[in-house]
């Protein structure tokens, strides 16, 4: 912990410089002494940056079922325990395990170049050796019969299963710099290419799903060398990386630029050769768990306030914003509350769910395993939208929950009242994030929205979602906001009614307790 303290001290010095330019405390904070202390502890002694270095840089990627995620679970328990907060890892099932090693992808003909790319999650490796092979582009077929007839031509090849983009410049760069006619032409070309490739995949009778899907399995059966794909995000240098269910043929994602290079060489019959050396280990079904931290309630210990953020992440980078940012916010909020409100009226839980990226698996399991928590839930605040300041809260279809939240917000410092827009009663959530398994049961669980910071381009699910993308001023502010809201929810004398707004309520989905393939 000595290194953590040294980093914390450097971060506190920087925070002190920033605070010199902030309005005085009396101008920021309400006269409620608890709110004042939350503000002081959260703003003056934040541990967000050293925690981020530990989670993102040292522990790193947290794919569900991986050793990295288990290490993060254990780190959370150890860290909470050091703060005097009870925490546990609660197992709910198993998921396919996988250990990511190094990825080396080279173009070796007609010229040499090391390519920017990485394995898809759960990809098999190359068995400790170089595998060199030619490439082939998945053609357009009339129907699945023609696809099956073509398969022998793919044997022993790396198969390209995505379009080569005509440009890797983001749309906003075209809008800012191209002539209107040129920008329109490029936009039309991109749209046509997307539609043509959608039809190309559908004609095979299979699907890529969220990676290689059932099509990948069929290509693997045909004896291919591997699958090459690309999912650029319309940002500079970023691409998304998801999953494969193949167990023999490796699957890799390349950057827009390097995929385009290989695609054009293949299209032009330049006979490119790729050499791959991929280290990976398929581990079979592995135990998976949520990490739950608890500050016990005093007077209403069977009523609950939940601070919610999923811990798992796609692992092309370190999952800093999706959803490491939410993890840090909830950890910091709990640390602040333990110091300021060690004996809240209601029990305050931090739920660090796993399996969110596989379909809200951990949070669904917890809601099934703990009906008493769902029944006694006063409020859940769920964070899953990156590093930005919380600037909106989505409704949950519960009028009484909306009324209480409006009251709580009205008692917060002016800076938060001006910053956070509440959407009112709204509609219940059908499954976008970890609040949904609670909200579908009629419990007050809401998603927090954040300032954008180009989240879709450079953060969620991409190869660039790393420590340096986190805005720690916003993390510090959000932790204070969440601690204040948890305090208000915990101490409110009234328990929130389950009366629902008119309309159709989404059905709850069961939690899979072991790997459930997504092939279509």
Residue ranges and their predicted role:
Residues 10-22:
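Bacterial N-terminal signal peptides
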Residues 29-34, 53, 57-194:
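Noncatalytic luminal/extracellular "stalk/propeptide" segments of secretory-pathway proteins
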Residues 30-66, 92, 102, 234-243, ...:
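N-terminal capping segment at the start of a domain
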Residues 32-34, 123-148, 236, 241-320, ...:
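Soluble metallo-hydrolase cores and metallopeptidase-like ectodomains found primarily
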Residues 35-43, 57-67, 133-141, 147-149, ...:
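Second-shell loop/turn segments in exported
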Residues 50, 82, 336-361, 380:
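Short helix-loop-beta-strand segments that form the rim/entrance of peptidase-like active sites
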Residues 110-114, 128-133, 152, 156, ...:
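Metal-dependent peptidase/peptidase-like ectodomains
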Residues 196-209, 213-216, 220-221, 226, ...:
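Active-site-adjacent substrate-binding region
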């Amino acid at each position: 912990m000595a290194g953590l303290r040294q980093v914390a001290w450097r971060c506190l010095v920087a925070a002190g410089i920033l605070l010199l330019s902030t309005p005085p405390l009396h101008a920021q904070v309400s006269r409620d002494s608890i709110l004042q202390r939350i503000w002081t502890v959260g703003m003056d002694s934040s541990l967000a940056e050293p925690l981020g270095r530990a989670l993102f840089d040292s522990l790193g990627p947290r794919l569900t079922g991986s050793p990295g995620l288990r290490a993060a679970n254990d780190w959370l328990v150890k860290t909470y325990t050091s703060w005097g907060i009870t925490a546990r890892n609660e197992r709910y099932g198993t998921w396919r395990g996988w250990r990511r090693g190094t990825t080396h992808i080279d173009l070796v003909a007609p010229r040499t170049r090391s390519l920017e790319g990485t394995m898809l999650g759960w990809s098999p490796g190359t068995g400790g050796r170089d595998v060199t092979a030619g490439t082939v582009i998945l053609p357009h077929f009339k129907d699945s019969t023609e696809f099956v007839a073509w398969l022998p031509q793919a044997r022993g090849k790396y198969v390209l299963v995505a379009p080569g983009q005509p440009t890797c410049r983001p749309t906003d760069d075209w809008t800012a710099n191209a002539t209107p006619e040129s920008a329109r032409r490029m936009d039309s070309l991109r749209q046509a290419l997307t539609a043509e490739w959608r039809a190309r995949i559908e004609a095979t009778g299979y699907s890529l799903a969220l990676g290689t899907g059932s099509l990948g399995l069929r290509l693997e059966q045909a004896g291919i060398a591997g699958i090459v794909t690309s999912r650029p995000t319309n940002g500079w240098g970023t691409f998304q990386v998801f999953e494969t269910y193949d167990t023999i043929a490796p699957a890799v994602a390349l950057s827009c630029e390097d995929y385009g290079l290989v695609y054009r060489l293949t299209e032009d019959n330049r006979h490119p050769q790729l050499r791959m050396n991929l280290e990976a280990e398929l581990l079979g079904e592995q135990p998976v768990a949520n990490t739950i931290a608890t500050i016990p309630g005093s007077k209403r210990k069977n009523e609950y306030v939940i601070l919610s953020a999923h811990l798992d992440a796609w692992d092309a980078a370190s999952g800093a914003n999706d959803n490491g940012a939410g993890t840090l916010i909830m950890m910091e909020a709990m640390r602040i509350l333990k110091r300021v409100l060690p004996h809240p009226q209601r029990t305050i839980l931090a739920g660090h769910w796993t399996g969110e990226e596989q379909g809200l698996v951990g949070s669904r399991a917890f809601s099934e395993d703990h009906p008493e928590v769902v029944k006694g839930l006063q409020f859940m605040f769920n964070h899953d939208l990156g590093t930005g300041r919380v600037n909106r809260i989505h409704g949950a279809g519960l009028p009484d929950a909306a009324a209480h939240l409006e009251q709580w917000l009205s008692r917060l410092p002016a800076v938060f009242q001006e910053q956070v827009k509440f959407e009112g009663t709204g509609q219940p959530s059908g499954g976008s994030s970890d609040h949904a398994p609670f909200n579908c049961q009629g419990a007050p669980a809401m998603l927090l929205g954040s300032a954008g910071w180009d989240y879709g381009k450079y953060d969620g699910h991409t190869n660039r979602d790393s420590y340096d993308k986190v805005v720690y001023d916003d993390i510090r502010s959000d932790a204070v906001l969440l601690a204040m809201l948890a305090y208000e929810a915990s101490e409110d004398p009234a328990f929130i009614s389950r009366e629902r707004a008119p309309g159709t309520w989404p059905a709850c989905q069961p939690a899979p307790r072991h790997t459930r393939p997504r092939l279509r």
